[in-house]
Amino acid sequence: MTRAGCELLEVGTTNRTRLSDFSKVTDESAMLLKIHPSNFQIQGFTEQVSASELADLGTESGLPTCFDLGSGTIVDLTKFGLPRETTAQEVLSSGIDLITFSADKLLGGIQAGVIAGRKDLIDSIKQNPMKRALRADRITLVILESVLKLYDPPNDLEKNLPILRALTKPMAQLEQCAGQLTNAFPSAFEVKTIKTRAEIGSGAMPGEGIPSLSLRITHPKKDANKILRELRELPIPV
């Protein structure tokens, strides 16, 4: 941003942002940007601008629009029994010019960033001298391509994509894993399996969760900090 000579100006408030807040563009405005709330969710008296509303405003004002999707996904996750997350395709179909999202996390690939959208804007981004320093290397691209091919039909994503395989693991398998871990503790420890809701995290589905299990670990002579330290000092840290 410093190199480009631009300034990021926030609009609206923490819990309420209206289209009228975005509408206060000036001759110096260069882009309209909306950002995924990442790992938090605001409840109660809230208001936000939809992607389609922002896209329409961008068309009216002659400004490009960008939506940072955070984690990002390219499939409807509700098909796998997971909470809904807006897909990259849906945002682009709403008229947004550019989107950014992660290549790892929900997509299930290698750590990298993806920029997609209008070709002329992508071509302009490619001209930035910083691109050579920040672009993905060949190994990253090869791994990302192999992951994206898993999405080609016919596919069996919940079995072939590790992230989906983990998120959709049946409760029976989780119970089996919990039992194996419980049996691995020395007899002095008291280990109980409890039902919980796991947060996906990594900028995805804030406030949502999926049914999961946790282990509650206690010891008559060790407090929580000592147990935690011992777990972290194992050959395979926990």
Where are these regions (language model features)?
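Structural motif of enzymes handling amino- and sulfur-group chemistry
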Residues: D120, N128-P129, A136-F185, R197, ...
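Short, well-ordered beta-strand elements within core beta-sheets of diverse protein domains
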Residues: E10, A166, L215-R216
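Conserved PLP-enzyme active-site core in the AAT-like
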Residues: T2-L150, P186
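Conserved C-terminal alpha-helix-loop-beta "cap" of PLP-dependent enzymes
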Residues: M171, E175-V238
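Short N-terminal helix-initiation segments at or just after the protein's N-terminus
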Residues: S38-N39, E85, P153-I163, F189-T193
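Extended hydrophobic-aromatic, low-complexity segments
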Residues: S124-I125, L134, N155-D156, A224-L228
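Generic secondary-structure boundary/loop-capping signal
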Residues: K79, A103-D104, I122, K131-A133, ...
